[in-house]
Amino acid sequence: MFSLQGYEYFLGFLLISGAVPILALTTNKLIAPKSKAGERQLTYESGMEPIGGAWIQFNIRYYMFALVFVIFDVETVFLYPWAVAFHKLGLLAFIEALVFITILVVALAYAWRKGALEWS
């Protein structure tokens, strides 16, 4: 038979982590001012009212650079623990990391060849 012994702290944590946001949102709803007119409807950013419209089109190059950055940033997140435990992992982990790095180098070469890293 399945026993829940030892899970009391986990269950307590789940209950508290669910109750805290509910309590915070309920308290905010009860004590917040109800008025939705005038100054509350204005946009406020960095202490100044914005000038002009907010709907402008950004150049696609910004998104391409951001996407390439995120891909290689995630690569670093995956490779760091491997590098820390390199001596304990053995040859198989080394080969797996080489395959991972090879895939990313191929992706970088593809992005470079397609011009994703060119600004012009």
UniProtKB/Swiss-Prot annotation:
It comes from the Bacteria. Signal peptide: none annotated. InterPro entries: NAD(P)H_OxRDtase_bac/plastid, NADH_UbQ/plastoQ_OxRdtase_su3, NDAH_ubi_oxred_su3_sf. One of its GO terms (biological process) is photosynthesis, light reaction. Its EC number is 7.1.1.-. It is a multi-pass membrane protein. NDH-1 can be composed of about 15 different subunits; different subcomplexes with different compositions have been identified which probably have different functions. NDH-1 shuttles electrons from an unknown electron donor, via FMN and iron-sulfur (Fe-S) centers, to quinones in the respiratory and/or the photosynthetic chain. The immediate electron acceptor for the enzyme in this species is believed to be plastoquinone. Couples the redox reaction to proton translocation, and thus conserves the redox energy in a proton gradient. Cyanobacterial NDH-1 also plays a role in inorganic carbon-concentration. This is NAD(P)H-quinone oxidoreductase subunit 3. The gene is ndhC.
